[in-house]
Amino acid sequence: MCGIFGIYSYERLNVAKKIYYGLFALQHRGQEGAGIATSDGKNIHYYKNIGLVTDVFKNETLQNLFGYIGIGHVRYSTTGGKAVENCQPFVVKSSFGNIAIAHNGDLVNSDELRRELEMKGHIFTSSTDSEVIAQLLVRELLKTSDKIEAIKNTLKKLVGAYSLLIMFNDSLIAVRDPWGFKPLCIGRDESNIYISSEDCALTTLDAEFVKDIEPGEIIEIKDGEIISHKLDYGVSEYNPVNVDVPCIYRGAATCMFEYVYFARPDSTIDGISVYKVRKRIGKILAKEHPVDADVVSPIPDSGVTFALGFSEESGIPYYEGLIKNRYVGRTFILPSQNERELAVRLKLSPVKSVLEGKRVVLVDDSIVRGTTSRRIVNMVRKAGAKEVHLRIGCPKIISPCYYGIDMATKKELIASNKTEEEIGKAIGVDSIGYLSLEGLVKAIGRKDLCLACVTGKYPTEVNFEKILGRE
């Protein structure tokens, strides 16, 4: 999962500083690296490096990124390591001059596409599938003078998740894959048109939300105009669960984890408030897994809104039993287990006056490996909690994700081979309760969702050898 942000200034103003602010608003989507590319109409200028947005970009760097068109990226690695070569945007040479590409998502057929390109003589500078997309586009641009046709022909080869920003010298193009895995939206103000992974970044820049880019839609921005194109092929219907809620986009499979964990609570995805979804999840969770307790406490920050809903529905008072160190990043998206475990100790501190002698309900968004949860429960018990109950605002994660979320291998997923009782014992809680699949879908309010990680049913074909390799 990454964050992408683009601007086209129809008043020909430099956009690098605004992209910086947009990426800062999307920092929760990736903390390993950041990059910005801009175009002044003739040349593309770019800079990228490892680190947070505030670490990568200083005023001098931004001042050297001239241009009225620009794209930016914050990186969270799922394919490729931490090296600066894997940071984005990627800038490649084409028959139209240099082009820059920023990508959010993962392809399931990237290995095959990479091998085909290497056999044709392409040399890759990174290990990411984003560069594969860039090189495919370069080849298609040799065959036609129509940029949109070349992009469509490139997209026909891709299977998986891709929200893309593609910048030519004179235009900005945004793409959302036919499944709509990752969010992407458009905003504008009196001087600029914006493209963003989440609308919270539009709010930061005081821009007006225009629309969500639809699955299978290509948005072309040129000469200050927004032109919509649609892919001329569809995808198979994907309905892994029968729940009486509407579809927003027929055939879509938007990642449910955006609503549960990744997106900022103040964002709205495809017309649905993330905050309201999480509040509803907490209320449904309290109905599905009631418990006698004295305190409801979130595991911050992602558990906060769930815990508020749980408290409201159950009548159990809400307290902050764990305090977060705001200078430590999100533990789930750190790339190694050692880093995650150290981050937990640095990140959270128990409030003894809240927890001591109390029956405590801890509420969190999900359990992936279980190691973080076990450490937190141990921390709460050491603070004097009499009982510790865990409630999870997501069904059990039983299968890996191949679309851009680092959910490890199947054997590392604690729920893939354990019952709820066994998980509770392994983590050290008095009871554990997961949100049901039906409860999740009802809380989100749409059924055109990717639920592969909690059902094992994937919306696209996935190479079986790749699955075995990851297991």
Swiss-Prot record:
Boundaries of every Glutamine amidotransferase type-2 domain copy: 2-224
Protein name, UniProt field: Amidophosphoribosyltransferase
Similarity-based family: In the C-terminal section; belongs to the purine/pyrimidine phosphoribosyltransferase family.
One biological process term in Gene Ontology: purine nucleotide biosynthetic process
Binding site for [4Fe-4S] cluster: C255, C401, C450, C453
Residues the record lists as binding Mg(2+): S302, D364, D365
Cofactor binding, per record: Binds 1 Mg(2+) ion per subunit.
EC number: 2.4.2.14
Pathway: Purine metabolism; IMP biosynthesis via de novo pathway; N(1)-(5-phospho-D-ribosyl)glycinamide from 5-phospho-alpha-D-ribose 1-diphosphate: step 1/2
Catalyses which reaction(s): 5-phospho-beta-D-ribosylamine + L-glutamate + diphosphate = 5-phospho-alpha-D-ribose 1-diphosphate + L-glutamine + H2O
Physiological role: Catalyzes the formation of phosphoribosylamine from phosphoribosylpyrophosphate (PRPP) and glutamine.
Gene that this sequence comes from: purF
GO MF annotation terms: 4 iron, 4 sulfur cluster binding; amidophosphoribosyltransferase activity; magnesium ion binding
Active site location: C2
Top-level EC class: transferase
Disulfide bonds: none
Cofactor names: Mg(2+); [4Fe-4S] cluster
Keywords tagged on the record: 4Fe-4S, Glutamine amidotransferase, Glycosyltransferase, Iron, Iron-sulfur, Magnesium, Metal-binding, Purine biosynthesis, Transferase
